[in-house]
């Protein structure tokens, strides 16, 4: 009904989004402008008409809406559609395609101003603690390893009692990161809430912008990959989370290359058992 009140250019935008919603979640504003023959300023005005700050906010909400409207009954067991006739190579290609798609989706969903804000907080923090349970806890351990190699103090915590105790002991100047694909893991949400109340800078890494986890976060980084209820071990989710952490890590190294190099050499020497 609202389409009738829109300009012709805005109507083209609306019709394109309705026809190709998932493609829009992986498009830049320039892509959408080109496909609809509407100026980028028109795209932004269209998003603001719908109540969003801009295209990035609209795109995030659209991706979340597409993910949550999937029927639970049709939730797949695997990331890729695998048939009985697929051989090992064919399955490998499908998994490769899954990872490629989810990384493109994640790059489009990330708000780079939020990313740079997290990098700045990490550069100046006293310590960083990463909270996550289950598969997200394993991802947190990987980031802990990366940060230790470049000299940042902190830990990855997945035991809920340890998470709560550590979170409440944080203070201003510390950073707490919560990893949860759904953004609803109660242990991780509670840990980030305690950390925020203690004065720490809080960061959420999740697929769900409207989640309880993001409500407790100063910065919310959105990773891609629509995941079904049966996919707690999803390779797409794991790749998306690792991509976000690797982006933060790479930007940290870029910002202080000499410090990163010195810390890496010291930690490498410490691990050399032949000395």
Across the structure, where does each feature detected by a protein language model lie?
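Short, Lys/Arg-enriched N-terminal segment that forms or immediately precedes the first helix
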Residues: 1-3
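Short helix-coil-helix linker/hinge
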Residues: 6-11
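Alpha-helical scaffold segments in soluble metabolic enzymes
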Residues: 12-16, 45, 61, 102-105, ...
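Glycine-rich phosphate/diphosphate-binding loops that line cofactor/substrate pockets in enzymes
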Residues: 113-125
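Glycine-rich phosphate-binding loops that contact phosphosugars or nucleotide phosphates
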Residues: 123-243, 249-256
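HTH-adjacent hinge/linker in prokaryotic transcriptional regulators
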Residues: 12, 19-26, 30-113
């Amino acid at each position: 009904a609202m389409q009738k009140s829109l300009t012709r250019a805005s109507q083209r935008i609306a019709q394109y989004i309705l026809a190709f919603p998932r493609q829009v979640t992986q498009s830049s504003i320039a892509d959408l402008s080109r496909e609809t023959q509407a100026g980028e300023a028109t795209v932004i005005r269209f998003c603001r008409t719908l109540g969003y700050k801009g295209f990035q906010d609209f795109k995030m909400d659209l991706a979340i809406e597409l993910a949550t409207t999937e029927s639970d009954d049709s939730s797949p067991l695997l990331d890729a559609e695998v048939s009985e006739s697929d051989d090992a190579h064919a399955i490998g290609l499908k998994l490769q395609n899954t990872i490629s798609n989810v990384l493109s989706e994640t790059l489009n969903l990330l708000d780079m101003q939020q990313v740079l804000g997290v990098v700045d907080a990490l550069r100046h923090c006293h310590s960083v603690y990463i909270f996550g349970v289950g598969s997200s806890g394993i991802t947190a351990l990987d980031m802990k390893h990366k940060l230790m190699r470049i000299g940042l103090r902190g830990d990855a915590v997945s035991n809920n009692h340890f998470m709560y105790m550590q979170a409440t002991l944080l203070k201003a100047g510390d950073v707490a990161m919560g990893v949860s694909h759904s953004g609803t893991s109660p242990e991780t949400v509670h840990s980030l809430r305690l950390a925020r109340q203690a004065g720490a800078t809080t960061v959420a890494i999740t697929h769900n912008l409207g989640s309880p986890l993001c409500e407790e976060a100063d910065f919310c980084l959105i990773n891609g990959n629509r995941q079904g209820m049966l996919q707690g071990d999803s390779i797409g989710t794991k790749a998306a989370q690792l991509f976000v952490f690797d982006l933060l890590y790479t930007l940290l190294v870029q910002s202080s290359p000499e410090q990163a190099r010195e810390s890496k050499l010291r930690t490498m020497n410490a691990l050399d058992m032949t000395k």
